């Protein structure tokens, strides 16, 4: 039977495009995540970037838009996660932070889980699914509302939410992606995450076929 562990082990980083990602922490510190020589490099950015290196255009405006995937499952950016009024307006009780170097702002007000994930195509996003899914399910069991966020709420957090829907609702990648895109139009998981999500679907379809064969034998 083709399991999630097999999917994770079989996934190859070698064919994916390299890139770098900037993260802004709660204190305003800039962190650059890059992949070089088969290693992740995380450095603090001292000088403001003149642009071009990572194809990054700085946007100083706050992104407080929250995508309502389900009444109890929300997707957003670090700006939303750091805005108390936005969190209260959406009745958030749990916050899943999958950014790198982004602090949790209101520790006494919400239940947090932080998992540092680099927004690189080479990052094995599937390996983070089990603990992320468990936290989301825990919030649901407690009749809570969980916000999943990364830095921009575009790639990492979106991939986690898409994967969760594929797993919990046995839906296809296309259907899950469309649902999340409709709720938060800005989502755009990086190329590696997109490939892994498709691989995840293939594994689930293989498992379904195996179960059908077992039941018919």
UniProtKB/Swiss-Prot annotation:
GO terms for biological process: negative regulation of JNK cascade; positive regulation of JNK cascade; positive regulation of MAPK cascade; regulation of JNK cascade. Transmembrane segments: none annotated. The keyword Hydrolase applies. Gene3D superfamilies: Protein tyrosine phosphatase superfamily. Pfam families: DSPc. The active site is at residue 150. Expressed in the heart, lung, liver, and pancreas. The expression level in the pancreas is the highest. GO terms for cellular component: cytoplasm. Phosphatase activity is enhanced by Ca(2+) and Mn(2+). The modification N-acetylmethionine is found at residue 1. The keyword Acetylation applies. Has a dual specificity toward Ser/Thr and Tyr-containing proteins. This is Dual specificity protein phosphatase 19. It comes from Homo sapiens (Human). The lineage of its organism: Eukaryota, Metazoa, Chordata, Craniata, Vertebrata.
């Amino acid at each position: 039977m083709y399991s999630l562990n097999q999917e994770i082990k079989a996934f190859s980083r070698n064919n994916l495009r390299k890139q770098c990602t900037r993260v802004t922490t709660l204190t305003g510190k800039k962190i650059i995540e890059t992949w070089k020589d088969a290693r992740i490099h995380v450095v603090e950015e001292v000088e403001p970037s003149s642009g071009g290196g990572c194809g990054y255009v700085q946007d100083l405006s706050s992104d407080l838009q929250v995508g309502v995937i389900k009444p109890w499952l929300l997707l957003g950016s670090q700006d939303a996660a750091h805005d108390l009024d936005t969190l209260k307006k959406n009745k958030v009780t749990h916050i899943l932070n999958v950014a790198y170097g982004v602090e949790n702002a209101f520790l006494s007000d919400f239940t947090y889980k932080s998992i540092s994930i680099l927004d690189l195509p080479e990052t094995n996003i599937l390996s983070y699914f089990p603990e992320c899914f468990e936290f989301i399910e825990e919030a649901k069991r407690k009749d809570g509302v969980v916000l999943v966020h990364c830095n921009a709420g575009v790639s990492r957090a979106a991939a986690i939410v898409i994967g969760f829907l594929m797993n919990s609702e046995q839906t296809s990648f296309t259907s899950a992606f469309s649902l999340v895109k409709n709720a938060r139009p800005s989502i755009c998981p990086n190329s590696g995450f997109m490939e892994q999500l498709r691989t995840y679907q293939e594994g689930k379809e293989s498992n379904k076929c195996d179960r059908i064969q077992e039941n018919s034998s």
